[in-house]
Amino acid sequence: MSPLRVRLYDYRKADVERATFIIEETSAEFVNTIRRALYTLVPTLRIEEVIIYENDTPMYDEMLAHRLGLIPLRVDDIDQFELPDLCDCGGKGCEKCQVRAELEVEGPTKVYARDLKFDHPDVEPAFPDTLITEVGEDQRIRLEVIAVPGLGLEHAKWKPVSAVGYKGLPELEIDEDKLKEKKITYECPQGIIRIENGEVVHIDEDRLPECRMYKEYERETDGAVRVRLRDDAFVFNVETDGSMSLDTAILKALDAIEHKLESLKKNLQKEVSGE
């Protein structure tokens, strides 16, 4: 069995991190396992409870609470917190499994995520300039929130990523005899391949992972050029939601997979040995 190979194809960082990896010598099932682990098994911190003491704005309490619950919260070391179900307090609420914040504003003004005042120095909104609502003249909002660690398996708001996807690595299949016979001329809009009078004059192999012209190649070259998606190599795209770094999210997803496999291994050994 050949070892799995991974290389970073593209990385960009602005408000969030985006990366594309090429994963080879693997299967769609394994790559999909990583995708699902990123969505469901990586803990993040999110607002779970909202206690509204005063809200004079036209926005319903339920809508206000819903907006607060979807704000990504950034904490560099999520390991300092425990999932409520696993905490020593039994989920009743303590400094290990929850963080509190207060919000108190008077109008007229706009309310942003940065207006939440957390009682933990390491916790802050991933995007402080996120607009929550507007408070008009003689209006007031006073509330308290409780944020807890959770998994995307429980609710989508706890996902550390906004998008994860994969596809088979594109590979060109070229019938050179057919190209010459029909004297085909074609240039890919993405600049990946150029054919002049039946001759392939340019192929940008490095940009093949970006290829999106599967049907056009076949149509414009009368089937002489086709794109095949490999089933043992994949283009893996991931984008964070700002709540943690990309490398942290990926490593924690892999740790979660490893933990489940170790648990499965121990239980199978126990069953087989009859202990």
Swiss-Prot record:
InterPro entries in the record, alphabetically?
Answer: DNA-dir_RNA_pol_30-40kDasu_CS (IPR001514), DNA-dir_RNA_pol_insert (IPR011262), DNA-dir_RNA_pol_RpoA/D/Rpb3 (IPR011263), RBP11-like (IPR036603), RNAP_Rpo3/Rpb3/RPAC1 (IPR022842), RNApol_insert_sf (IPR036643), Rpo3/RPB3_RNA_Pol_subunit (IPR050518)
- Gene3D superfamilies the UniProt entry points to: 3.30.70.20, DNA-directed RNA polymerase, insert domain, RNA polymerase, RBP11-like subunit
What UniProt keywords are attached to this protein's entry?
Answer: Cytoplasm, DNA-directed RNA polymerase, Nucleotidyltransferase, Transcription, Transferase
Q: Name the SMART domains for this protein.
A: RPOLD
Any Gene Ontology biological process: DNA-templated transcription
One of the record's GO molecular function terms: DNA binding
Q: Where in the cell is it found?
A: Cytoplasm
Per the record, the domain of life is Archaea
Listed under GO cellular component are: cytoplasm; DNA-directed RNA polymerase complex
Question: Is Nucleotidyltransferase there in the keyword field?
Answer: yes
- Enzyme Commission number: 2.7.7.6
Give the reactions, separated by semicolons, that this protein catalyses: RNA(n) + a ribonucleoside 5'-triphosphate = RNA(n+1) + diphosphate
Q: How does it assemble?
A: Part of the RNA polymerase complex.
Q: Which family does it belong to?
A: Belongs to the archaeal Rpo3/eukaryotic RPB3 RNA polymerase subunit family.
For this protein, the record's NCBIfam families field holds:
PRK00783.1
State what this protein does.
Answer: DNA-dependent RNA polymerase (RNAP) catalyzes the transcription of DNA into RNA using the four ribonucleoside triphosphates as substrates.
- What protein am I looking at? DNA-directed RNA polymerase subunit Rpo3
